[in-house]
Amino acid sequence: MNRSNITQTTPFTIAIYHLLAIYHLPFTICHLPFTIFYRMGFLDGLLIDPKYQNADPRKPEEIDDPQTIISPDTRRDNRIPPGQSRTKKWPVLDAHGTPNIDLATWSFEVDGLVEHQQKWSLDEFMQLPPVRVYADFHCVTRWSRLDNVWGGVSTREIAKIAGVKPEAKFVLASGYDYGWTTNIPIQYFLNEDSLLAWSHDGQPIPPEHGGPVRLIVPQLYAWKSAKWIKGVRFLEHDQAGYWEEGGYHMRGNPWTAGDGERFRWS
């Protein structure tokens, strides 16, 4: 069976998945829609999943590269935020399916409140100074994947090149998937552990997980880490993105007391 068929989801199954998350159902129950609707390929997908984690997550001090940036949340005594459960897999979730991206014409643009608008081709983008970040990954649908190493370019480097103006307080990230956007407070976008990533655990990020380049903002829920990113705009005022317009939290901090900042009414 073609693995792209296994990992593909539909807006219907995504909606069910998120609805179950609202009502605090356990992690295994939240996965039932995918078990039912994965085109009868769910077990095959488990067996061939190259990202399955057999071992316990490493501790930050076990990372052998001294140049790797350590996300501060990995130093917590309990690395699982409120209402979350650990998964050893790397589930695939998206709003519109995986877009077909022509790498020859791929570009990344920076505009808005900047001194110098920027546009890079993929080759140019991957020549930017690289960083490595060790971080955990928390999905609003109540699963957390610990122990990830991302490679790419720091968001701080992008901001420095573009010359972000002082009045910029928010970032609107846009993706190649049918006009998808998400908003991020600039202080989170510019955290030391935030980056525009092209690799995960030493391998190129596969298309179903947001490759060739995706945003990673480890200190917010993962819907803020836009897949298939094509640009960022620096703004003075906050502007709701795709999920935020539907009621998701404008910030999305998983560590807020209670149940995290999942929805605007939470």
Where are these regions (language model features)?
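Arg/Gly-rich low-complexity intrinsically disordered repeat tracts
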Residues: A15-F37
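Structured, non-membrane catalytic/scaffold regions adjacent to prosthetic-group chemistry
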Residues: G41-S266
